[in-house]
Amino acid sequence: MTDYFVNEYFGDNTVTSVLKPEEVRERFGPLFCRKFLVMADEDSGRAEIIEECRHRGAIEWDVMNRNRAGGAVESIAVDGASMTISAKLGRYPVHFGAAGDEIGGQALEGVEINGDEIATHWAGIAGAGVGVAACLPQAPGVLRTEYPSEADMTPGGAKISRTTIYTPKYEKVSIGIDDTDTKESGATWVLASKCADACDIEGVEYLNMRLIQLNPKVPNKTTNCVGSALNFAVRPGKIEELLEFVRNFIESGAVSKDTGIAVHTGLIQPESPYLEKIKTEVLTIDECEAEAKRLGIRYIDTAASKGRIGALGAVLWANRGIEAAGLHGEH
């Protein structure tokens, strides 16, 4: 008899109970998940799941076990008490059971799009079952949770729990910004950060701001030659409203007449030789505009000036590692 379970309920759509977050909280008491948000990119067949917990140890154990279980998980990045899962859309077999060699005690069995919602399918055993049946389902951002059986609603001990958690569908929007300042005044990262803080559009969730070190050897630059990127999770139908807000905020607050703003939508990071060139070469506006067009990146600024060079660099590096903030070759 095997000691792990591979998609035990695969294809079984039976639902015994559906609970909203407040009902989960009432049943189990308040627990520890502080955020649960899912973005999807149907063109690439990918999803990104952001989860924040009050306790770092829970995040770290979940990450190791979800990776071991496989399923829809492709990779997971950890930042303190939060994780970001890169996942594939669909339902997949998992190596799930009591934690052991190549077996995870918690598993992401699938991610599916249902209209303007996203369903994530989970399995957990023992304490990890409490995570998928009681903790995640009451997180801010969750709409409701389906439990296939009454047994799934009594997690803990040595028992297995499975759930399907529904959240609003979001898309990822990355915005690169450069050349808002001059040698006399201004700071692009400050203006970009203020823009993010001021955005209160319903259906838009601010994720993070990144600083991108550009080539400090270019002759026509501000002192440190640094661009900024803003990342947002955005509900379908809200993207243009967000972009209009960002453009108006940035251009009204800029002290430079050369401000550039570039936009990329989706979860697949563009691969381009300009990832290196933006840190090592002196580039022209024309070649950066041509590369942006090739990659499906669009400019929304009105200046159409040299800021577009750094804005392209910022959006290309917006979702990469700490190397974004360094000179070429620094790690």
Predicted regions: what they are:
Residues 2-331:
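Conserved mixed alpha/beta catalytic, RNA-binding, or beta-rich assembly cores of soluble enzyme
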